[in-house]
Amino acid sequence: MARPAQVAIVGAGMAGASAARRLADAGFAVSVFDKGRQVGGRMASRRDRETGLRFDHGAQVLRAHGPAFRHRLDAWRARGIVAPWDAPGTHAAVPDMTAPVRDLLAGLEVHVGRTVTGLTRNAAGWRLALAEASEARVFDALVLTPPAPQAERLIDSMAPGLGAPGFAGLRKAAYAPCWSLMLAVPQELPFAGDVLRPGEGPIAAVFRESAKPGRSGAAPHVTLHASPEWSAAHLEETPEAVEAALLAALGALLGMAIAPTHRRAHRWRYALVTATCGAPYLYDAAARLGYAGDACLGPRVEAAYDSGAALAERLAADLA
């Protein structure tokens, strides 16, 4: 019996997880590598050790516009992995935003804390260079799902021209940054509903984390997203400076002094896709190298899911 084709996937966000699940279900051997401490990518969550509070400091909600992701959302909702929140058709993940990605990757070979620094390919297949460990295996195919500039750097690490012709679209992708601020506060902040969207100024949105499904009884805590313009203007400032500035902006917005019991800022350099690659995925059939992500279809979790699934279908057909 022939061994199943070996596929390496770089990135354990929604696009990588979607591709991994499709390929694994089709009978291929999948290995996922991610530099983060946990899976999820920008569907990120952080648990404060002192308070035990969970903060979704990246993507906040999931929405479905097309049938494929709607079917997946319905299945997750039936199993308690997502639940309606904030507005009709909008879902939060339970217990945090990594849950859908963790579900897709369940039972698969996943390596976190592994930074892929280079790629090589010869007649035998693909090899990965890792910053933290050695990886001796040779893979039959390779899927890249990091933000487009990071994927482009990996492709550039190869011999000139290798696998590059089909990936010019990576240079079309553009992103806006976002500073995220996680706050635990003594009492619920005085704004109506679960999400505050001022419409102007440094703050794009404030999300009432303690009101999310599955967090009943949690102490008051919020996540604040700065506007793309403010984030770009302050991109290289220290987290401490950003914390102070955004806390002051929130206090001014609400007309009150805010004394958080916990605060932490996180910078997302590639937060929001503002220009796409112009295709559902990028693929070089001769090299068996593909790229998927929200950079292909737009700034939504659904776009990352659809892109990863579409690339997986194409790759599965080639490997069959």
Placement of each model-derived feature along the sequence:
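Short beta-strand to alpha-helix junction loop
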Residues: 61-68, 82-105, 236-245
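N-terminal FAD cofactor-binding segment of flavoenzymes
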Residues: 44-83
